[in-house]
Amino acid sequence: GLYDYIIQLITRFYMKMTDGQIPDFENKVKVMHAWGGRQVPGVYYNACKNNGISPITFGEAKKHGNAFKYICEKFVDATQYDANKMYDYVLIDEAQDFDISFYQLCRSIVKDDHIIWCYDEVQNIFDVILQNPKETFANKYDPKGIDLIEEQKKYPRMRNDIVLHKSYRNVKKILLVAVALGFGIYNDKLIQALENNKHWEDLGFTVVEGDCSKEERVIIERNEKASPLVVDESRIEDCIRIFQAPDFSQELDWIAKEIEKAITVDKLLPEDIAVICLDETNSFNYFNGLEQRLEAKSIATYNVMDRDYVKGFYREGNVTLSSIFKAKGNEAAMVFVIGCDVFEDKKDSRIMRNKVFTAFTRAKIWLRISGTGEECLKQMLYEMNQLKEHEFKFDFLNKPTHLLDKDWNERSENYDNEQAFYEELLEMSRKKGISVDRILQMYTQKKKEDEKIDE
């Protein structure tokens, strides 16, 4: 689902940096699915072809449990973790969805361990265990893996971890609702949390009160600068709208009418609207019924769940209908998250919470939430109302729970300290008229002399 969007973003950035030149997607930059096949290029399929290995079909792979994990492990074994180097760099997006076997496959086909992976653990909807690089890249062919601390020493000016403090995708209100529900801030028990105050601060929040490393009350708010996307104050209340339908048919009727209004009255383009179904079991019935209603209103739809779907999330003149997985990484001005009644019985599930977070954060400006049944969104509404009553701050008792990945936090802090020292060193170099190289030579020589004295 991300294919076209990534192509668009790369092209836009490349043109800006090169005064209008178009990137060479045939020979220089490859944007691919992870698996691939004869009709659609993919990392695994292309790697097999490049290394003289017969690609394993899905039909065969699924006999062994986790099909994708199986084929990646087989590739690593077949090449003994040392395949032909096909790429100068490999960038993995939505990396939280991939098993470590895929990371190892990518490492085996790239030069000099030049791998960049981007992830958001709160969007981990498959319960994949995110490990540190040592464990992720270590196997029987290389027990050491990749040690980012050691790599940092080799390249002191290069940052191994970059934490994105700002969120340009969503207006602040939608982001805060998504985080509150994703973490279970106002649930009767906290579902997941960040390890300490700095972890929150790194992500654009301010801990107003409390210590997030302890079991105590904490109050957290969002920095204004960390959410630069703003909407007119008169339309803030319209950002999020919720509908509890008496029955399934009326839920579909409401969604269709809201989409029609958005296009005819608010003048949104159909491709500015996406519908994401939280109820995966009934997604076919939802989309089938919605397609019929929208067709009656002369509104075209693009169902990325169709069997004939190949790639892309948007189609000009069409409203997108999508699963949560296909929507990951994409966005739309207005997003309908439907079938939300399934949340009620799974409110204590971390995977369900992550799905809600992922679905809600696809919306840039307008979020529409619906479900079927009397008081079907009771828990969700309760938590959202609690957030509103607390003036969109997180006010909760921090308790032991699932901690989101914290390794990068320590590495990020190490980098900040090292970068600050390096800048001080540069400043001293300028003031004293001594080059940095000369300072390092003097330091090395002095260290050797001190070691001799100690002996």
Model regions and ranges:
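P-loop NTPase motor core
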Residues: G1-Y45
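Conserved helicase motor core of SF1/SF2 NTP-dependent helicases
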Residues: L2-Q21, Y89, Q96-T358, R362, ...
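Conserved helicase NTPase motor core
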Residues: K30-A34, R38-Q39, V43-E135, K166, ...
